[in-house]
Amino acid sequence: MDEQRVDIVPSPWHEGERRIQQRVGVADRMEVFGRKVIRDFLPEQHRAFYRQLPLLLVGAVDPAGDPWASVLEGQPGFIDSPDPRLLAIRARPTAGDPLANALEAGAAVGLLGIELHTRRRNRLNGTVAAADAHGYSVAVGHAFGNCPQYIQTRDYSFARDPASAAPTAIESGTSLDAAGRAAIAAADTFFIASYLDPEGERARRGVDVSHRGGKAGFVRIDGDTLTIPDFAGNLHFNTLGNLLLNPRAGLLFIDFASGDLLQLTGSTEIVFDGDEVRSFQGAERLWRFTVRAWVRRRGALALRFAFGEWSPNSLLTGSWDQASARRAAESLRSRWRPFRIARVVEESAVVRSFHLEPADGAGLPLFTAGQHLPLRIGLPGHERPLLRNYTISAAPSDDLLRISVKRDGLVSSWLHAHGAEGTAIEARAPEGDFGIDPTIKRPAVLLSAGIGITPMLTMAHRLHELGR
């Protein structure tokens, strides 16, 4: 009986979401999971959550078909849920907001409630059921929670009464100016709105708005094109699924200190693989956004936020400078390169760890958990350098090469006796097929003995990073 019901209940995912889930091998699992966690009503916990928020992220589509992301704000309590299928918002877009005329009765909207000081967030997709001079009522289509990854904590305060109109300088353009590029370059957070009209039917339109975070500077700027790494997430692919079928998107960058809002609309392209993806630590794919229009509203937000802590997930990701250095290192992959010992750590009476850094100005080579590092070391009394392989005991996200060596054998004993900070050695790019697929969710038992624990440590570290 239950199996028959699963067959007739519509999938919680649309075609674009399913296609990306299939691409990464999680479609069947996510079909079951989605039916459990995506609801057509607000659970009581979500209703209470929205009531305590001072802001709400909104995604919608303007009359020209361009999506925009924006924000509504108010004292906690400005959002209410009179019943589980309705969210009431007592706020409207402020002067100059591209969504000022888009949030009318019948309009599809995406909402994101985010509590920055706790990293909690919940999402809602629905339709504006009613609109008046004071705000909106939104009928729930889908409601679901999101994980707290990549959210930097911030504490909020109000610089003025959010209900009062503030004089706002409004600027706009079609090509990013210096101020816009500076705001984006400094950002560790932004929000993206996307939408899809299934089979071209506007009446079935669905809009999403979601959060993106990383280290400051994780958005690369090339003229009017932004490149954003896409990190491991909840595998819903709501945003990327929309972009796969409809490349239009709207971005919102908030200056948390000044209340300035920078809103962009434009088109996107998803990059699923390639050297750029592989070289950016933590990226599972990339996407590019080309600006078509922008609006900047200085001081539009009454809220101000004080930075708290970095998300641990953000700190595990790379940077564009690191990615560039890694690509340079990849071009040298088949060559012996000069390295130096940067640090020596006494792990036990018989094991020392050696931290290695490139001495040629190029970056660290890419590697996967479980691979080994070929070394070439010249020893006194030997005409030719000796070759040895040592398992890398650092995780790929550690931004270092570390080998942990037991004092046993000719080269290993020499490293213990003579390896010190500044000692020069040669290494080639990491090699080996021994490893574990961190994307597969199934129990794993790692067995090792003695110094053989080194590949297990890096595999366990990698699995922990990805929450497996």
What does each model-found stretch correspond to?
Residues I392, I453-G467:
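Histidine-anchored nucleotide/phosphate-binding helix
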Residues L53-A60, A108-G113, A187-P198, A249-L251, ...:
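A short, Trp-centered hydrophobic/proline-enriched beta-strand micro-motif
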Residues M1-Q52, R121-T227, N242-N246, S258-L261, ...:
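C-terminal edge-of-domain segments
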Residues E115-T118, A143, F256-S258, G378-H382, ...:
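Short, charged beta-turn/beta-strand-edge "cap" motif at the junction between a beta-strand
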Residues A329-A424, R428, G435, K441, ...:
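Ferredoxin-reductase
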Residues L103-A105, I184, L243, F367, ...:
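Short, well-ordered loop/turn sites that connect or cap secondary structure elements
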Residues A91-T94, F231-N234, T290-R292, L356-A362, ...:
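A structural micro-motif recognizing beta-strand termini
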Residues A64-W68, E73-D80, P84-H134, G206, ...:
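Short, structured beta-strand-loop surface elements
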